[in-house]
């Protein structure tokens, strides 16, 4: 009889230990998920550009995030707040360096108006010219027929990936940005004000 009670007690103890172990492992699995902040971000560059050379109130500001690992460029993300003057037909343009391609674009520009579609105000242009400084252009709120698009505000996120599997650390690249438009002496001009945002893995954050 004593042997039977002892066996029952041991089995109950083992069962309790098993239940406690399972509950502990379950708790560990649910609490082990932690958010990653700036994973693989090796460089951040801020920018701010206004159409100061004109009477227009067009501007953009934001940051460029460079992701990389083992001395290679892996992804570039441009996050820009945009404001375009109602009378501006030049809008905002981002010039993408050679050997990079646009993988996705997310935009809220003009999205606060129910009758408008954000993607209608974004266009991507490419050039095959060998002497061109830039191969791809992402234009926001720009009308090449010189008609103002109505202006507006919003946020645009542009994701870039390299055409090649890896990019050398010795290679420095730049993102070109321009804003505004004007007509002077009968000539129309897009991109009245511009900057370049230099990027290099060597420089770090």
Indicate residue ranges for each PLM-predicted region.
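Low-complexity, intrinsically disordered segments enriched in Ser/Thr together with acidic residues
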Residues: 133-172, 180-184
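Surface-exposed beta-strand/loop patches in extracellular or lumenal glycoproteins
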Residues: 87-99
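Extracellular/luminal low-complexity Ser/Thr/Pro-rich, glycosylation-prone repeat/linker regions
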Residues: 25, 31-55, 167, 178-205
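N-terminal Sec-pathway targeting helices
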Residues: 1-15
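Short beta-strand elements of extracellular/lumenal beta-sandwich folds
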Residues: 67-88
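Hydrophobic alpha-helical membrane-insertion segments, chiefly the h-region
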Residues: 16-26
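Short edge beta-strand/loop segments characteristic of extracellular beta-sandwich folds
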Residues: 79-83, 93, 161
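A surface/secretory-pathway sequence property marking extracellular, secreted
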Residues: 99-140
């Amino acid at each position: 009889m004593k042997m039977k009670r002892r066996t029952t007690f041991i089995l109950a103890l083992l069962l309790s230990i098993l239940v406690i172990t399972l509950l502990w492992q379950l708790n560990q699995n649910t609490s082990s998920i932690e958010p990653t902040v700036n994973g693989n971000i090796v460089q951040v560059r801020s920018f701010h550009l206004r159409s100061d050379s004109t009477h227009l109130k067009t501007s953009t500001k934001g940051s460029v995030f460079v992701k990389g690992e083992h001395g290679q460029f892996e992804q570039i993300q441009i996050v820009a707040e945009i404001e375009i003057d109602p009378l501006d037909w030049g809008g905002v343009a981002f010039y993408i360096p050679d050997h990079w391609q646009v993988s996705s674009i997310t935009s809220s520009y003009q999205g606060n108006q129910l009758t408008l579609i954000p993607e209608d105000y974004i266009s991507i242009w490419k050039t095959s010219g060998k002497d061109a400084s830039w191969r791809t252009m992402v234009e926001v709120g720009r009308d090449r027929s010189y008609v103002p698009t109505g202006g507006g505000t919003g946020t645009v996120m542009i994701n870039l990936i390299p055409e090649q599997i890896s990019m050398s650390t010795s290679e420095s690249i730049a993102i070109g940005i321009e804003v505004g438009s004007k007509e002077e002496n009968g000539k129309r001009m897009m991109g009245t004000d511009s900057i370049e945002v230099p990027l290099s893995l060597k420089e770090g954050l």
